[in-house]
Structures are given as C-alpha cells and as structure tokens.
C-alpha cells in the first residue's frame, strides 16, 4: 500500500482480491457507458443526416439550460465534431434570467473546464414575468417567448447559423399528445425548423434519443445539473399528466413511444381528416386501380408487440 508522505491509498492499492467485486462493477459501468456513448453518437448522427441539420461551415449555438439534456447535447456534438465529414463550430450559450438562487458560476466553470467557446447572456426576464403574470398563474409561456426572442438576437450577434435545442424523443412525442388531447390538432416538435421571422434555423439533434439515455449519460458524466424549478413555476398539469402516461406506457409496452415517433415520420394524409392536406370533397371513382389505394373494408394488420421479459401468455379455454 502506498503510504508515502501520508497520502491516502489509491485505487491501485486496493486492487487485491478483496477489491475484485468493485473492480468488476467498475468495468461493467465502463462497458455500459461506452455502449451508451456509441448509441448516443449514432442516434444524433442519424438525426443530423436525416434532416441535414449541420452543414459545412455552420456555427452551432447550443442553448444550455444546465439540465441533463442540454449537457448531453453539447457533449455529444463535441464528440461528433472531431470526426464529422463537415467542419462546424460550436458555441455554448446560457441565458441567465436572474432567477433567485440561480448558481451563476456553474455553467461558466463547466465551459472553461472543457475548453468550449461560450457566452453568458444576462437578461432579467424573471422580474418582467413576475410583474406581468398574475400571482398563481403559470409563467412558462411568457418566459419562453422572452427567452426565444433574446436567444435569436444572441445568435445574430455571435454570427451563429443554427440554434441547437436539447429536446429529446420523449419531449417530441409528449408535445404531439398534448396537442391532440388538449389542442385538437396533430402537431409535435419538428426536428428542424425555420423561425417565424424567417431568419433562424432551429435544430433538435436529440430527436431520436430517449430521455432515459440522456439521464443515464448525465449520471455517468456527472454533469453539474442545475435544477429546473428555481423560478417556482412548473409545466402545466397537462404536460405532467402526459409525461407520466408515457412513462407508464414505456414500462408496460416497450417500444410504444418509439413506434409513435416513427408514425410522425410516416403520415398518410389521405387517411386523416384535414381537407387542407387532401381534397376529400372532390374524391371520385376513376375506374383505375391504385396499388397504394385503400382497401376500405379490410381489417388492418399490425405486428405483434413483444411480450415483457418474464411474462408468459396463457390461453384459457
């Protein structure tokens, strides 16, 4: 054992027979971490390719909140940057909205430690929101509008060509559900969009990544997470309910959320009810067979969902 100069024992000092279980656990964690890193890089790379998110010479502004998702986004983009087929720059940006208790040092310290270019924008939107929104009402909507306008201006000032947000697969599916349940429309979060002013391109490179993977990666990397409830306001009860529903679905029916995400990319407009997407009024029989047409009276066939591990289906009678 290394006890010179009264130093504490190192990991090597404990690498005897008694330490074997801990060493095995460490190797297992390292293997799982490596597999997760490869999966994250693969899924983010697939999203970038599928939707042409990043192009030669882009300057990507990664919007950092201090949560697990934005940390994961920044980390994976930096890993991909080293081996990407195109050259692009990254700048990490945090909007400090002057919420009471916000740890101002955490993000700058982290950015410096990893050597990434960064910018902290200080804007007291917290006071504005508290002054305008009545007590007891949710502040999220106004806060997000103010934040969006400020971030667009920062992107212009920094010469950024794209803004990258940390919304993941579960966020996208939850937004679709919220709009269907409470808004009466089929609308989610697009993986790539042009802002309403026509000047900015927003990308969501984590669109294929499940939340459980960003949570696990944040745990492995020990990111200095900043809590999201400093302002005292939370997402509405509707989003809370939908997120809980999706979590339960993921436990009981593995693959359902992934299937819903795939459905968002395979929309059959002729089989919905939006007259702006299909001319139902003028639909008439032509007498010409259409191999892709509808067999109106046929029963739709779906693949059998995989059974949960450890469960056996027993037929009675």
Swiss-Prot record:
Organism lineage string: Bacteria, Pseudomonadati, Pseudomonadota, Betaproteobacteria, Burkholderiales
GO annotations of cellular component type: cytoplasm
Enzyme class: transferase
Name the UniProt record assigns to this protein: tRNA-cytidine(32) 2-sulfurtransferase
PANTHER family: AMINOTRAN_5 DOMAIN-CONTAINING PROTEIN, SULFURTRANSFERASE-RELATED
InterPro entries, sorted: Rossmann-like_a/b/a_fold, TilS/TtcA_N, tRNA_Cyd_32_2_STrfase
Highest taxon of source: Bacteria
Enzyme Commission number: 2.8.1.-
Family note: Belongs to the TtcA family.
Keyword Iron attributed: yes
Residue ranges of the region described as Disordered: 1-29
